[in-house]
Amino acid sequence: MTLLNYYSQTKMAKGERFGYKTAILHLAPYKLSGKNVCPNASKACATACLNTSGRGQMNSVQDARINKTNACWKDRLQFLKDLDAEIKQLSKRADAAGFKFAVRLNGTSDLPWHRYKLDGQNLMQLNPDVQFYDYTKVFNYLDHGVKNYYVVYSHLSLIHISEP
């Protein structure tokens, strides 16, 4: 299963003007897969979610996002190994084309990737020449201490989705 979308979206292709090839990981947001990957989701966030924009409207895309989310939950260690291998492969491809490489792991999720370890290191530490970036609604994610991980705090709506 391919985990990352590699410069296949219009927004990501714009990064080439700045010397970057980019990849993004799309999981099934909020609780769409049965697992909550957006811990601080508000009604406004869930309503405005980009999950179904563009190609995201297609059933096959939604199924793939659910499958990736389930794979991440079922065997996180294997998921991290697969993700790391894909990052390394795409980074080499970007480098060979004369580009830097950037990865957004929370395309349609808000998980603490800086806390998930593989051989004692997170994905950012395993790939120091790759620039990672994300948006988050979890303020504590800003204090991660990883040099090549840029996180932007996104304002949290005061209206939260009520739990059943």
Label the predicted regions.
Residues 125-137, 153-156:
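Acidic, His- and aromatic-enriched active-site or binding-groove loops in soluble protein domains
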Residues 110, 156-157:
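Short beta->alpha junction loops/turns
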Residues 1-129, 140:
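Conserved Radical SAM active-site core
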